[in-house]
Every structure is written in C-alpha cells, then in structure tokens.
C-alpha cells in the first residue's frame, strides 16, 4: 500500500477513491505498490518464511534510507580460483572476459590444485547446489558470533570468498574493511589514498540467487536479486531475519559503490519508463511487508553480461515476479493476463487489424491498455466524469458508497470556531468548489435527489440548480466551472428515460426553412411554440406565480395593497392564496437563503397594513369623546362593517402562518445540517412568524374589543326586561332573531353579526370558537357584576325578578344552541346561571337550607358571592337572614376579604390553530375572481420584465392562438 493511500483518518485516499474493486486492482498505483516492495533490512520485518513475517522480539537499529534490493540480472560464474590461502592476491584472481562472475567453490576447467583448498571451500558446491533450510527462529534466541563468507564477485572475475568473523554488533562497514584486508586491498594504491577511502569505495551486498539449470554447469552461481547493505546494518542479524526458499541460495558479496549506484540508477530508470517513479515508492521499504524474494529490478542492459539465454529471459522474469507475490497477487496477475488477452482479441477483431503489423509489444503498454478498460459497477450508482479540473488527479468513475454522497473540496481546512471539516465523500480540488458543494441521495427508492449547498454553483442538465431536484440516470450534473458528471444507476435496469432530457428534441437533419432559425437549439421548440407556452402560462389556471427576486418587493406590495384596499371581488382567503404562491415559488425555485428574506418582508408588509387599518378604526371610534358630545353606541351593522378588514386579515394571516410553518419545516428537513447559515435562516423565519403571530393577536384583540364594546350597552336589558309582556309568546329553540323578545334582540344581534362576519371572512373554526368564547366570557362577567351591584341598597334579589332573568338567559342560550354555539355558551355562562338559580329557589325551600348545603349546590360561586346574595335576599318586611346562612368561622375570613365581582383579566388565552393550512395550491384555480387577480399579477410581472429591456426589444404579452 502506498504511503499516500493509508486508511488513516487524516488521509482520504483509500476510503474516498470510490472505485470498484476491479478498477483499484488494475490501477497504476497498485502496480506501483508491487514494484516498490523491498527486502527487509535489520530493522524491518522479520520473516520465518518467504511469505510470512513476524516482528523481531529485540529492538533493532533502523536501517539507513538508501538500503534497497536491486536486481542485477543473470550473473554468470566462470569458476573458482585454486591455490592455498597463503598465496599472493595475484594468484587468487584470474582475468576473464565473460562478465561479472563469482565462484561458489567448485573448481572449473584449467584450475589445478583443488586438493589444496580449505575444507570450507570444498563444501561450497553442495551449498550452491541447494541451500539447506535454516533451523527455525525459535531455536536461535540470540545470534552468537559466527563466520560470514563474503564473496569478491564485484572485485574481479573469478574471485573466491573470504571467511570473516562477525558478531551481532559487527556493522557492514567493519566487515567490508576486514574483507578488504583479507583480500589484500586495504590501503593499496588501487583502493585509494588510505584505508578509509578504500572502505568507502566498496559496499557489502546481500545477494539472492540459485544455481543454473541442469546442463549449464554444476555449481554455477547466477544472482537474481541484490540489496546494498547500509554501513550501520548488522549483517549477522540480517542473515538471521529470513531464509531463502528451497532451490535458492543467499550470500554476501563485496561490490564497488559506483557499481551499486549504477545498478540503482538502472533500476530507477526502468521503473520510470514504466510510469513508476522512484520518489513514489522509496518510503515503502521501511513499512511494507515484503516476501522473501524481494522486489524485482530492471534487467541488465545490453552491455552487461548475461548468463541466461535470451529466450528464457521472459519466463525467468515471470518466475522471479511470482516469487515475491502472495497468492492473492498471483490471482490478480492471472486476471490481468486474461484481460490483456481479451483486449488483444478485441483489437484483432477490429477493422484493419489483419493488415496491421504488430511487433513485439512492451508488457507495460498492455498494462496501461488494460487499465483503460474500465468496467463500471453493477450494483451501485456512480458518476461518470465528462470534464474535470486536473486530468492527472481526477478519476473517471466516482462510485456512491453510501445512500448520501457529498461532493466537496479536499484539504484539511476546518470549519468555523476550529470545528472539524465537514464530511465529504468525493474530493474535487477546484478553486470554485465549496467544502460541501453538493449532496446526492440515492436510496433504494427511485429517483435520486440532488441538493446544492448554499452559494454552490450547480447545474442540472444545463440549468442552474437552486433547490433540491430529482436526478435520473443519464442526467448531467455540473459542479462549478470545471466538473461535469453523468449520473448512472445500474440498479434501474434500463428503466430510465429513453432519451436524456439534455439531448436536442430534433436529432435528425436540420430542417430547411426559416422555422429552424427561429427555434431553440437545445430543446428544438420554435419561437411561436415558446410564445404559445408563455401565453398559456399568463392566462392559465395553474396555481403558479413565477417571479424573479428583483420583482419580489413590487409583487408583494401589490398583493398587500389590493387586500388592504378591499378592491375587487377576491374570495376571503384570496390574499393568503396569492402570498402562499409567492412563498411556494421561493421555496421550490429560488436559492436556499431567499425564503427567510421573503418571509420577513411579507410579515412586515402585512403588519404595516393592519396597523394602518387599526389606526383608521380608532380615529372613527375614539375612546374619549369631547365634552358635550354624547357617545353614540355602535350598532351591530356598524361594527360589522368596521371589523370586516381586521377579520379578513386575521383569517388570511392565520392560514398563511400555517402554510409558512409547513414550508419552514420542509426547508429545515431539506437543508444541509452542516450549512453554517442554517441557524441564521431559521432565526429569520422565526422572526417573520413572530410578526405574523403578532398580527393575529392584534386583529383578534381589536375585533373582540369593538364587539364587547357594543355588547356592553346591550347586556343590561337581560336583567331588566320582562319576557312575559302582555300578548308576547315565548319563542321556541331555533327561532329567528325577529321573534325574540325586544329586550334580547340587541344582544343577540351582536352575536349574530359576529357569527356572520366570521363566516364571511372564512375565519378558522378554532379562532371562531375562541372569539365567541371571549364574548361569552365578557357577557357572563358583565352580567354577574351587574347582578351583584344591583342587590346593594335596593330590593332586587326577589323570586319574581329572578324568574324573569332566568327566562331571558334561557332564551339566549336556546338561540345560541340553534346557531351552533350552545356548548361554548353553556360553559361560559355557568356562574351567572348558578347565581340566578339560587335566586329562583322558592323562599320556603331557601329558608330550610343551611350554609353548607348551599355551598354544595352552588360550587361555582365564591363564599363572598354566596354570602352577598343571601345577605341581600328579600325575605319580607322586617325579616333578616336566618342564622343557618351564616358562614362558619373557617370561611369567615374568605367572606370578609373576598371580591364579589368577576375580573375581566382572567379571560382564556388565545391559542393559535395547529395543523395543516386550509390553503389548497394543487389543481386548477376554480374561482374566477382569484383567476382574474392571478392573471393581473402575471401581466404585471411581465411588464416589469419588459421595462428592463431596451425599447426596441419590448413587446406585449403573447396571446395564445385558438385551436
């Protein structure tokens, strides 16, 4: 694995490539990783076999960074030199023009004196023929001092080995110096001016090879791999780290540093020619887990000696490559070979392939050709790159590994306040790509959805994308100014559209005539067809109102102005419907941050219009009249006319608020939770909805204020009027207002006017109930306070008067029951009914009752109110209340300090309606008045757009031709 492809959290490479398995295997980086493997050094991986490594139990010194394994090609051995150890150095070397050779201990032709050789040298043929497996590592706890055989293959042709005593602390530099001394080169003129320079000119190499095949020559050594040991490495420990496979031999060789450098440069040059530069794989030697065979190096150049036949070079190289690979890599090599064969077969079947003269192809060319054969995934959606920013870094296929895929800019940038950078699946390193640029959701259900981030330039099939939209297979997705992708989903099984929507509608030959010149090149529609579509929109009944952000203020102002003026015959909820169309267009078509700004502007316009209307009503109905000018009470008809605009605004604002709440919730769900502007948008929406709440509160308060002000002058008749007048017949339940007793008609007239007003304005049922609840609360408190006040100082609490009040109250409740308000009226008139029922008890029964029984029968009355009614009850001349009516000592304090009057401030709070809005923006507009207003607004927007054009480009709205 490359150092840049770690699975660590700080690097997104491996986890963010989004390539299928086949693509990753065939990528150049994968082969680069294979070429970059090294032999282990003294501080690297310790292996007990050629395929399995285990970490050494002892801490070892780290190797120098230049320690590498190089392939030197086939090194041919020419035979060993004969003679005793005491002979001169000139007798140990013999010139041979056969290239770089080394002896493994067997005497060659023409080398007499083999009987005088050391015993260790006599055993060398057996060692070279096949190295016996070393004892297991478990039996060698600590490396004792030993003798290392250092061959002088790099000194001269035919140089034999020298035995050098080494310990676990002996370094490669020390052993080189000792070996040179044994060879008689230390301090020689050829070696340099001194011993130090002579040692610096040579390096100790760890060589891996095997005897030649049968028939080539018994005991001939052929080096396959070579690694230069660092000066600080311990050769004895290196020897203990691993052993060669059966059939392979390992030995230490003494070579010149210049030769080692040349081999290194040749290896790097071969790697660069295959597209695998050395800087990419050099760091791998310290952390990769290599096989015992090491890394294959470049073959020797034509000028170097080769001990292998030319025809067997490819086979031997393939065997060498297989030696250092695991089973899985060998399987992948077979897969590559099969892919190359299929590619060659495809090329041979191409037209003209039979005539083409194809020479010997470089295997690297076939590898690169195989890498170009990309097979897309079959079970995951992916994006096909059509245009990128940097061809050297961009991939061709980006696979969706999650249901939600995020495109964004790479890097280690953090968010605001030091927060970590947002999670991104695919990094696009273009300057105009945002940290979170675009999000695609492709779940099990189709279609997929694409949502741009705030301020991110995204196009969908060539059109600017501002909101979430559907993404179908074959659609083009543009990110910024550089990236263009095609979305593909193999899971659909070809169920997508037959033709992509971005293709021209007329793919045939260009039709002659002027019609083609006046048509759109992209969609193929002619100018006349486009004009008809525009005319159909301007006059259509679809609930759609399109506008540009620059026209927003004029459009909203026109809708609010028309609603405030009450001009036209719009339906009651027409203004809310038109404003909701504006909100819907902003939520669906315009940018993410536009909706909060529109809601704020809309709420302020409505508030200003309502404030102006309240001020106008206040000027006509002042609270403080000038002295000498009598106050004229409001009639039910007059109050209905005055309150109609306020009631309309209350109804429209209530429905609009419910609609806005739904859209804000949708916006919060759709919005990217990583968007730093999301909180700011939600705050702006909350402020706008708070203004709408305030408008509803004020309109409700003003409406009930003027209604209760009218009721205040009509309610006393319920206590004073006698329903049993001569010739009067009591009406039954559900009677008309004209059939009611005259004393009840003004009060019932106010209730009826309020009921008709709420119905005409289509006020929400919850607000209708709360409006009448407040009216009944006020009526109950006002009548009860008047009843308590009437009993002080005059005989009012009598059975006959109580019967009249009870009858009037029953008639009012029956009429309200017929109007559908019986339950609300019964609940709020309960205390007044309880007080009147107490006064309606016959005198004889009342005298027999005690305080405790009366408290039990009339629980809604407070002790002070009950004591007030009993203490002022008229029992007759000179008769006072009996002692049984006196409260006990435990309630005496409550009677003395309690208030007998009801408080008007304890009214129930206003609760705004919950649930979905009653505005229906689906289906054609059926109301003719609303359709006319919608057409007027569309043409107004058309005129505003035409005013921005030069005079010679302006024209009137198109008119649809009749069929």
Swiss-Prot record:
Q: Which GO terms describe its molecular function?
A: GTPase binding; protein homodimerization activity
Keyword Chloroplast annotated: no
> Positions modified as Phosphoserine?
188, 280, 292, 326, 328, 331, 419
Q: Which SUPFAM superfamilies match?
A: SMAD/FHA domain, Ubiquitin-like
Q: Mind telling me which CDD domains this protein's record contains?
A: FHA_RAIN, Myo5p-like_CBD_Rasip1, RA_Radil_like
UniProt xrefs under InterPro entries: CBD_Rasip1/Radil, Dilute_dom, RA_dom, SMAD_FHA_dom_sf, Ubiquitin-like_domsf, Vascular_dev_regulator
Composition-biased stretches (Gly residues): 96-113, 302-313
List compositional bias (Basic and acidic residues) regions by residue number. 1-10
Indicate the principal place this protein occupies in or around the cell: cytoplasm
Annotated spans, Disordered: 1-22, 35-118, 267-356
Q: Where in the cell is it found?
A: Cytoplasm, Perinuclear region; Golgi apparatus, Golgi stack
Entry comment describing in which tissues the protein is expressed:
Highly expressed in heart. Detected at lower levels in placenta and pancreas.
- In the record, Omega-N-methylarginine modifications are located at 94
Q: Which UniProt keywords apply?
A: Angiogenesis, Cytoplasm, Golgi apparatus, Methylation, Phosphoprotein
- Domain Ras-associating: start-end pairs: 144-259
Locate the compositionally biased regions of type Low complexity. 41-57, 290-301, 320-333
What highest taxon heads this organism's lineage?
Eukaryota
Sorted alphabetically, which PROSITE patterns does this protein's record hold? DILUTE (PS51126), RA (PS50200)
Residue stretches making up the Dilute domain: 600-897
Q: Name one GO biological process term.
A: angiogenesis
Q: What are the annotated GO cellular component locations?
A: cell-cell junction; Golgi stack; perinuclear region of cytoplasm; protein-containing complex
Physiological role: Required for the proper formation of vascular structures that develop via both vasculogenesis and angiogenesis. Acts as a critical and vascular-specific regulator of GTPase signaling, cell architecture, and adhesion, which is essential for endothelial cell morphogenesis and blood vessel tubulogenesis. Regulates the activity of Rho GTPases in part by recruiting ARHGAP29 and suppressing RhoA signaling and dampening ROCK and MYH9 activities in endothelial cells. May act as effector for Golgi-bound HRAS and other Ras-like proteins. May promote HRAS-mediated transformation.
**Subunit composition?**
Interacts with Ras family members that have been activated by GTP binding. Interacts with HRAS, RAP1A, RAP2, RRAS, RAF1 and RRAS2. Interacts with MYH9 and ARHGAP29.
Please state what the protein is called.
Ras-interacting protein 1
């Amino acid at each position: 694995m490359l150092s840049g492809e770690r699975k660590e959290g700080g690097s997104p490479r491996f986890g963010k490539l989004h390539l299928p398995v086949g693509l990753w295997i065939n990528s150049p980086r994968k082969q680069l990783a294979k070429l970059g493997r090294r032999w282990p050094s003294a501080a690297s991986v310790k292996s007990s076999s050629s395929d399995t490594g285990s970490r050494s139990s002892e801490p070892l010194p780290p190797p120098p960074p230049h320690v590498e394994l190089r392939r030197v090609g086939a090194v041919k051995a020419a035979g060993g030199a004969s003679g005793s150890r005491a002979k001169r150095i000139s007798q140990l070397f013999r010139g041979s023009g056969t290239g770089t050779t080394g002896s493994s201990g067997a005497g060659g032709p023409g080398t007499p004196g083999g009987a005088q050789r050391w015993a260790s040298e006599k055993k060398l043929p057996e060692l070279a023929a096949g190295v016996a497996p070393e004892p297991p590592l478990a039996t060698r706890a600590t490396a004792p001092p030993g003798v290392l055989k250092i061959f002088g293959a790099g000194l001269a042709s035919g140089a034999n080995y020298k035995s050098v005593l080494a310990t676990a602390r002996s370094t490669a530099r020390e052993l080189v110096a000792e070996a040179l001394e044994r060879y008689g080169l230390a301090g020689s003129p050829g070696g340099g001016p001194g011993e130090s320079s002579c040692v610096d000119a040579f390096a100790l190499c760890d060589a891996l090879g095997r005897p030649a095949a049968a028939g080539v020559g018994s005991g001939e050594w052929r080096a396959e791999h070579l690694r230069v040991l660092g000066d600080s490495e311990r050769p004895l420990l290196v020897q203990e780290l691993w052993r060669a496979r059966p059939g392979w031999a390992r030995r230490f060789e003494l070579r010149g540093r210049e030769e080692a450098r040349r081999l290194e440069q040749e290896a790097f040059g071969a790697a660069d020619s295959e597209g695998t530069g050395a800087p990419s794989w050099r760091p791998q030697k310290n952390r990769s887990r290599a096989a015992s065979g090491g890394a294959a190096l470049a073959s020797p150049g034509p000028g170097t000696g080769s001990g292998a036949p030319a025809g067997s070079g490819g086979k031997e190289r393939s065997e060498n490559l297989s030696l250092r690979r695991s089973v899985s890599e060998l399987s992948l090599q077979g897969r590559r070979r099969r892919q190359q064969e299929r590619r060659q077969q495809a090329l041979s079947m191409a037209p003209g392939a039979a005539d083409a003269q194809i020479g010997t192809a470089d295997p690297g060319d076939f590898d690169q050709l195989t890498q170009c054969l990309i097979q897309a995934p079959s079970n995951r959606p992916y994006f096909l790159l059509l245009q990128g920013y940097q061809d050297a870094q961009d991939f061709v296929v980006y696979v969706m590994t999650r249901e939600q895929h995020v495109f964004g800019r790479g890097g280690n940038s953090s968010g605001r306040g030091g927060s970590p950078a947002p999670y991104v699946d695919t990094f696009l390193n273009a300057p105009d790509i945002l940290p979170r640029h675009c999000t695609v959701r492709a779940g099990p259900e189709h279609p997929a959805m694409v949502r741009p981030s705030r301020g991110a330039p995204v196009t969908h099939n060539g059109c600017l994308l501002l909101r979430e939209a559907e993404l179908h297979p074959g659609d083009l997705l543009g990110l910024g100014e550089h990236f263009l992708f095609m979305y593909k989903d193999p899971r659909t099984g070809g169920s997508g559209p037959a033709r992509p929507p971005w293709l021209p509608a007329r793919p045939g030959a260009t039709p002659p005539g002027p019609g083609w010149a006046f048509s759109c090149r992209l969609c193929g529609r002619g100018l006349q067809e486009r004009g008809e579509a525009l005319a159909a929109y301007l006059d259509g009944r679809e609930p759609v109102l399109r506008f540009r952000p620059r026209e927003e203020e004029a459009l909203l102002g026109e809708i609010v102005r028309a609603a405030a003026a009450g001009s036209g015959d719009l339906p009651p909820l027409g203004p809310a419907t038109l404003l909701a169309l504006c909100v819907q267009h902003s939520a669906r078509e315009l940018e993410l941050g536009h909706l909060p700004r529109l809601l704020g502007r809309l709420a302020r316009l409505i508030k200003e219009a309502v404030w102006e209307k309240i001020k106008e009503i206040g000027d006509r109905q002042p609270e403080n009249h000038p002295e000498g000018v009598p106050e004229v009470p409001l009639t039910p008809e007059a109050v209905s006319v005055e309150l109609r605009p306020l009631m309309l605004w209350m109804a429209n604002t209530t429905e609009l608020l419910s609609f806005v709440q739904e859209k804000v919730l949708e916006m919060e769900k759709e919005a990217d939770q990583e968007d730093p502007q999301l909180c700011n948008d939600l705050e702006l929406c909350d402020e706008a909805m708070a203004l709408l709440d305030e408008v509803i509160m004020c309109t409700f308060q003003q409406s009930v204020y003027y209604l209760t002000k009218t009721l205040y002058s009509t309610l006393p008749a319920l206590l004073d009027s006698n329903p049993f007048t001569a010739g009067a017949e009591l009406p039954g339940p559900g009677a008309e207002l004209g059939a009611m007793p005259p004393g009840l008609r003004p009060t019932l007239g106010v209730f009826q006017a309020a009921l008709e007003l709420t119905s005409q304005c289509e006020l929400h049922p919850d607000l209708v109930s709360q409006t009448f609840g407040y009216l009944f609360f006020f009526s109950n408190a006002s009548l009860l306070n008047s009843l308590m006040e009437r009993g002080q100082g005059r005989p009012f609490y009598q059975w006959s008067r109580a019967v009249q009040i009870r009858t009037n109250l029953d008639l009012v409740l029956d009429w309200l029951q017929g109007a559908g308000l019986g339950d609300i009226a019964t609940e709020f008139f309960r205390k007044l009914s309880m007080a009147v029922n107490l006064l309606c008890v016959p005198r004889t029964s009342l005298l027999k009752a005690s305080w405790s029984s009366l408290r039990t029968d009339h629980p809604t009355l407070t002790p002070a109110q009950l004591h007030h009614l009993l203490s002022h009850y008229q029992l007759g001349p000179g008769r006072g209340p009996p002692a049984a009516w006196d409260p006990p000592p435990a309630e005496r304090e409550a009677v003395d300090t309690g208030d007998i009057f009801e408080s008007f401030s304890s009214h129930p709070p206003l609760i705004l309606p919950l649930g979905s809005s009653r505005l229906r923006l689906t289906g054609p507009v059926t109301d003719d008045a609303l359709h006319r207003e919608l057409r007027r607004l569309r043409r107004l927007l058309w005129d505003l757009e035409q005013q921005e054009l030069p005079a010679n480009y302006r024209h009137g709205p198109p008119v649809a031709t009749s069929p």
